[in-house]
């Protein structure tokens, strides 16, 4: 259900702007997207898990805020990120 440390490190390495960058919006959105995808798979088997569904909605909202910030600051980075992650917008 959660992402492994190896997968998280791979996401950080792939989306980091500089070496060791874990706080950029791209990295945060990539990690949130991975967690959201894992939870949506979880809900296919556990339809009544409303406690986790609330966490999913919180993650989606947080990702949306980060994407809005990135779009406001640099639209080129924003469009590149949603293209590589496969997020529709």
Swiss-Prot record:
SMART domains: Ribosomal_S15 (SM01387). SUPFAM superfamilies: S15/NS1 RNA-binding domain. GO terms for biological process: translation. It comes from the Bacteria. The keyword Secreted does not apply. Pfam families: Ribosomal_S15. GO terms for cellular component: cytosolic small ribosomal subunit. Part of the 30S ribosomal subunit. Forms a bridge to the 50S subunit in the 70S ribosome, contacting the 23S rRNA. Belongs to the universal ribosomal protein uS15 family. One of the primary rRNA binding proteins, it binds directly to 16S rRNA where it helps nucleate assembly of the platform of the 30S subunit by binding and bridging several RNA helices of the 16S rRNA. Forms an intersubunit bridge (bridge B4) with the 23S rRNA of the 50S subunit in the ribosome. This is Small ribosomal subunit protein uS15. The lineage of its organism: Bacteria, Pseudomonadati, Pseudomonadota, Alphaproteobacteria, Hyphomicrobiales.
């Amino acid at each position: 259900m959660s992402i492994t440390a190896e997968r998280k490190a791979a996401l950080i390495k792939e989306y980091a702007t500089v070496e060791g960058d874990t706080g950029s919006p791209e990295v945060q959105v990539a990690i949130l997207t991975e967690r959201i995808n894992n939870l949506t798979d979880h809900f296919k088997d556990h339809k009544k898990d409303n406690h986790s569904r609330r966490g999913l909605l919180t993650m989606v909202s947080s990702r949306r805020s980060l994407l809005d910030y990135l779009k406001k600051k640099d639209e080129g980075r924003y469009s590149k990120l949603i293209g590589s992650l496969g997020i529709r917008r």
